[in-house]
C-alpha cells in the first residue's frame, strides 16, 4: 500500500499527466469518471477520480471541497485514503487508494465460507474506523454495506475500508447537525423526525449493518417508505427463527445497544469496542456458520445488479416522513476495481424473511435510496422499497 500520504495538495499548476499514467475506466458518475492509474516513478496502482468542473454547480464544488478536507484528516487502515489532489482549469482530480476487493457483500458471497466469528471481525474493523472518525470530529452520515469495501487479499482475514464521504460533516464539540440525509434502511430515527443529531446516527447505522451481516436481511422492512420509516420510529424489529437460531446472545445484545431510539442512550463507538462480543478473543471457538445469511446476500447482490437506482431526496416531517424523487447530484462514491462498481449506480435489494414464516423465501424488498433534505412537495410514499444505493 502507498505510504501515508505526503503528496496531498499539489500546486495548482502541477499536471497530473506528469505524475500518473491513466489506465482503464473503473467507474462513472454524474459528474466524474474514475480510472485506474499508475504512478510513473513508483509504479503504485491508484484510482483517479476526474470531476468535470463544467458540469457541477458552485454548491457541488463546495461539497467536493468539503469531502476532500474530510478525507485529508482521516488516516486509518480501515478508511479509504486520499493520496493527493490535482486542480486544473477543467477538472478536479482526486487520487485515491485503489481498492481491489470490491464491496464487502460481494466478497462474502464469493468466499462462501462465513461465520459469526467472521462477522464479528468485520464489525470490529468498522467500529474501530468510526471511533477514529468521531474522535477527529467527522460524522459519516451514510454508513451502509455499499460503502464498505474489501481490500484484503489474505483469505484468512478480510480488511474493510469505509468509503464515500460525500455526505460526511466535520463538527465541532457539542455541535448538533440538522440536515436530513442518509439511506432509508440505515437512517436513524432522529433524522426522520427532523431533530438535531450528532455522531450517534452513525452508531444506529452500524447496528443495522451488523444485523444484516449476521442474517443477510435488514431489521426494518416494508413495502413503502412511509411504512418503513414508521417501523424504524416504532423500533419494530426482532430476531426471527430460523435465521437467528444459534447466533450468540452477545451478538444480539450488541445490536440492541445500537438500535435504541434515544440517541443519548445509544452506545458510542468507544463503548462498542469494549462490548464483550467485539472484545472477547474468540480464538478457535466455533461459532455458527451463516449459510442462510450468504443465501440472502446472494439475493441482495443479484437484485441490486438487476436494477437501476434513482437518487431520492427526503422531505421528513415530525409526524410523517415523506420521500419524493428529485434530480440530484450524486455523492462522491466508493472506488473499487471490481466489476460491481463499474455502473453509475446500483440498486441493492435487502431480501427479508418474514418472521411469521421463516422458511418461506418470499422476501420484502427495502428501497435504500440516498436521501437528502429538500423543499420539493412531490410525495412518493407509495413507491416500492427497492434498495437504491449509489456507487460510482
Curated annotation (Swiss-Prot):
Annotated keywords: ATP-binding, Kinase, Nucleotide-binding, Serine/threonine-protein kinase, Transferase
Superkingdom of origin: Eukaryota
Segments forming domain Protein kinase: 20-278
This protein's record includes keyword Kinase: yes
Biased composition (Polar residues): 317-326
Catalytic activity: L-seryl-[myosin light chain] + ATP = O-phospho-L-seryl-[myosin light chain] + ADP + H(+); L-threonyl-[myosin light chain] + ATP = O-phospho-L-threonyl-[myosin light chain] + ADP + H(+)
Active site: 142
Pfam family, one: Pkinase
GO biological process, one term: signal transduction
InterPro entries for this protein: Kinase-like_dom_sf (IPR011009), Prot_kinase_dom (IPR000719), Protein_kinase_ATP_BS (IPR017441), Ser/Thr_kinase_AS (IPR008271)
GO molecular function annotations of the record: ATP binding; myosin light chain kinase activity; protein serine/threonine kinase activity
EC number(s) recorded for this UniProt protein: 2.7.11.18
Biased composition (Low complexity): 327-392
A single Gene Ontology CC term: cytoplasm
Binding site residues for ATP: 26-34, 49
Residue ranges, annotated region (Disordered): 317-392
Family of this protein: Belongs to the protein kinase superfamily. CAMK Ser/Thr protein kinase family. CaMK subfamily.
Known function: May phosphorylate a specific serine in the N-terminus of a myosin light chain.
Protein name: Probable myosin light chain kinase DDB_G0271550
Amino acid at each position: 500500500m502507498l505510504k501515508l500520504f505526503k503528496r496531498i495538495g499539489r500546486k495548482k499548476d502541477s499536471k497530473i499527466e506528469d505524475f500518473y499514467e491513466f489506465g482503464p475506466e473503473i467507474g462513472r458518475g454524474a459528474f466524474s469518471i474514475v480510472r485506474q492509474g499508475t504512478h510513473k516513478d513508483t509504479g503504485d496502482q491508484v484510482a483517479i477520480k476526474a470531476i468535470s468542473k463544467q458540469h457541477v454547480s458552485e454548491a457541488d464544488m463546495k461539497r467536493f471541497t468539503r469531502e476532500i478536507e474530510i478525507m485529508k484528516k482521516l488516516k486509518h487502515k480501515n478508511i479509504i485514503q486520499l493520496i493527493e489532489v490535482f486542480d486544473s482549469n477543467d477538472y478536479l482530480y482526486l487520487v485515491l487508494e485503489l481498492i481491489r476487493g470490491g464491496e464487502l457483500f460481494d466478497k462474502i458471497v464469493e468466499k462462501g465460507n462465513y461465520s459469526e466469528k467472521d462477522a464479528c471481525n468485520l464489525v470490529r474493523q468498522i467500529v474501530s474506523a468510526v471511533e477514529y472518525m468521531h474522535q477527529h470530529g467527522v460524522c459519516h452520515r451514510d454508513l451502509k454495506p455499499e460503502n464498505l469495501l474489501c481490500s484484503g487479499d489474505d483469505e484468512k482475514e478480510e480488511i474493510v475500508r469505509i468509503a464515500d464521504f460525500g455526505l460526511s460533516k466535520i463538527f465541532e464539540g457539542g455541535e448538533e447537525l440538522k440536515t436530513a440525509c442518509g439511506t432509508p434502511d440505515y437512517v436513524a430515527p432522529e433524522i426522520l423526525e427532523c431533530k438535531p443529531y450528532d455522531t450517534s446516527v452513525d452508531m444506529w447505522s452500524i447496528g443495522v449493518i451488523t444485523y444484516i451481516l449476521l442474517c443477510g436481511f435488514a431489521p426494518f422492512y416494508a413495502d413503502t417508505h412511509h411504512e418503513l420509516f414508521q417501523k424504524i420510529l416504532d423500533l419494530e424489529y426482532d430476531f426471527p427463527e430460523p435465521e437467528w437460531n444459534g447466533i450468540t446472545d452477545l451478538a444480539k445484545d450488541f445490536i440492541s445497544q445500537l438500535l435504541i431510539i434515544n440517541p443519548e442512550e445509544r452506545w458510542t463507538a468507544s463503548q462498542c469496542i469494549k462490548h464483550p462480543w467485539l472484545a472477547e478473543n474468540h480464538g478457535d471457538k466455533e461459532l455458527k456458520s451463516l449459510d442462510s445469511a450468504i443465501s440472502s446476500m446472494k439475493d441482495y447482490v443479484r437484485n441490486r445488479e438487476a436494477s437501476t437506482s434513482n437518487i431520492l431526496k427526503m422531505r421528513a416531517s415530525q409526524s410523517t416522513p415523506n420521500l419524493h424523487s428529485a434530480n440530484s447530484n450524486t455523492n462522491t462514491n466508493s472506488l473499487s476495481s471490481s466489476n460491481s462498481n463499474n455502473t453509475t449506480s446500483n440498486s441493492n435489494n435487502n431480501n427479508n424473511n418474514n418472521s411469521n414464516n421463516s422458511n418461506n423465501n418470499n422476501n420484502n424488498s427495502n428501497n435504500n435510496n440516498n436521501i437528502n433534505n429538500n423543499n420539493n412537495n412531490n410525495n412518493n410514499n407509495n413507491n416500492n422499497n427497492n434498495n437504491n444505493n449509489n456507487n460510482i
